[in-house]
């Protein structure tokens, strides 16, 4: 039975790339970012009824990044990427909490957060990473001390970064070239290390049990040791290709290939 539906209008994307931003859900709040070639906005709906709770116009063009909902100082915030500005909205009211200068064209990677920081990246026609301290973040942060560190090279175009136990992992563009940084300081542990059997990557890396998994478009998943040194533990190839990010549930890894859905676990 259909409970409700909501027409948000026609979305006009450049180059016929289509849509890519996933709605974000927290409690009864369903957040949708609608950045396109027309009038862009972010809207929050009641998940039970589809009723519009708030809407904010956005001076943005196309983006594909999924918003991130997080809590800071008891306040729930919606963090969004963007070419012109990075923004955070109050989840309850839609008020802009903070903003700062944006990233590059075509922002696709989704924000990740941890240890009091949120990380926003992009990598089309340029490179951009901003590590933003959430404590005390308010108003325009562009030239403030809340921008803890930045990076202007070797950032991802499609894959989102992985923040795992204090280490931020980044792929370069859509290539199997991996870097790892101290998340708090930006100090590099290693940079642009080649994943030889996964040269092309759209999927975001994932981490669990002291390992990092990178699924390549050519069918190979590279397994690396989580840590400050680059060490490949295994390279597992299936007769398929992967663009979707792996999903980790308990002790299983789910891979959605071009042809099949795989569940991988110890027997």
Say what each PLM segment does.
Residues 1-267:
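Noncatalytic, solvent-exposed loop/strand surfaces
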